[in-house]
Amino acid sequence: MAGSTLGTLFKITTWGESHGKGVGVVIDGCPAGLSLCEADIQKFLDRRKPGQSRYATPRKEDDAVEILSGVFEGKTTGTPISLVVFNRNQQSKDYSEIASYYRPGHADYTFDQKYGFRDYRGGGRSSGRETIGRVAAGAVAVKILNELGITFMTYTKSIGPIAVSSGHFDFSEVTKNPLYMPDAEAAENAENYLDACMTELNSSGGIVECIIKGMPAGIGDPVFEKLNANLAKAVMSIGAVKGFEIGDGFDVAKATGKNNNDAFVLGEDGRIAKATNHAGGILGGMSDGSDIILRAAIKPTPSIAATQRTVNQSGEEISVNIKGRHDPIIVPRAVVVVESMAAITIVDALFSNMNARMDMLKKFYS
């Protein structure tokens, strides 16, 4: 199976299945000398861990990470970092009926068509548990970026029709509600909306927004290695993501040049800055020094208890009610996944940028 590796100089390879022995990641290209311990990674994994609210799957997993290689005496060694999380609470019997039919909205049918075989227990490689490896690698990437003064603000921007209000935005609220929304009023309304969805045996989607602060200008490459293109690839590779935006995104189609262009101005420090940020921090595929603002549209959880139509492997049309332990919404748990994929992409772009200019090479090797 190809397609499990991302990156060029900072490279990750995820592995494992939802109901296998474990899941994990191998990270290639992490510099030596970074302070790193399991607690650093665990903080990130705990943000996506199941069973933490009534809006997450009741599957109880500690998701405890173990560092198998690449770290010695609390520092990275420059060799591949291997991280593993063992699965502890599989209930594969919940999926025995699924072996005979294709779940609407899942990858069952496409896996079967490609490989002639599929792991029906929780979706195998297409399960949300695959993102554990991404988040573990993301924790390492964010630690590297924090050393360079680059930080993240990532949160749930909307759930169904309920969106965060700019007038009520308070990032400190994110950790105070189970939906990771920076707006207490919107979070309360979204909880009521989700409760209604659950009563109707239904699920909901939403939008995750990620703001990257402290980015220097000039990171990314023109043409086929644009920073926005690579961010889109990384975020769109998350199984539940169906849409991606940078800056004003699809709203630019309704704009004019006058109100879409960001005027350049001199900042208080005398450096070039922008008066607005419709571009979302990227121009010509390269960072412009402003905040990078991206959004990911997350689809509703496809496993719902309501009756759905499908076809079984005998070619018969049937009606199904999917059983098992499923999230009524995965948006809150996807927040850290989106952040992780963005961080991994940014680190790779920063490393690639080191050979862009002779003066940078001379400074490094002199």
Predicted regions and their residues:
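N-terminal, positively charged regions that mediate nucleic acid binding
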Residues: 1-59
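Internal helix-turn-beta structural module
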Residues: 11, 303-366
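A short glycine/serine-rich beta->alpha loop
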Residues: 11-14, 119-130, 217-221, 277-282, ...
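Glycine-rich anion/phosphate-binding loop at the beta-strand->alpha-helix junction
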Residues: 15, 21, 201-204, 208-317
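Glycine-rich, N-terminal phosphate-binding loop and its surrounding beta-alpha-beta segment
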Residues: 44-104, 108
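Short acidic, glycine/tyrosine-flanked loop/strand segments centered on an H-E-D-like triad
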Residues: 99-124, 308-326
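Glycine-rich, mobile lid/loop segments that gate access to catalytic sites or pores
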Residues: 113-223
